[in-house]
């Protein structure tokens, strides 16, 4: 007796790769700093409008394509781990900048000045810089807490930009898009190129200890 041929049943399994890419694009659009998105869409858009657009799940993949480039082959993109392990890039910059100016941190001793400095950079960045005093870069001391905070932020962002410059474009942009437009991360100086690797090895090690 001849048995009937088995009937091939076509299943509609979800494309896991596509879903993963879609989720990653949505996360990228939602985490992008509003100034970055406004610059691509319309600089006249209000911050509230931009935030509403970012929250729209239907628009998020398209916004990510706009931010990263419409000509990218999204099926071939490999979404690896975030370079900062998901941490705020501004905080990463402040940690690096605090090491850069650790010698100046030691000179801020009055309770009033210390409070003003910590208010600007955070207690964790202040402690982190002093803890890594041996890796300090700047020799010129800054005694004014406001000026010191500004310089910590500037040099920290510049180090972040230099560190990112040697990373693949997608991973680099995923971090830069979380920063507002106009930070020193966009134009690091040669001095930051030389120091960024060592400083950010300490920053990343710190992040890994926080979130093992």
From Swiss-Prot:
Origin superkingdom: Bacteria
Protein keywords: Nodulation, Plasmid
Protein name: Nodulation protein NolU
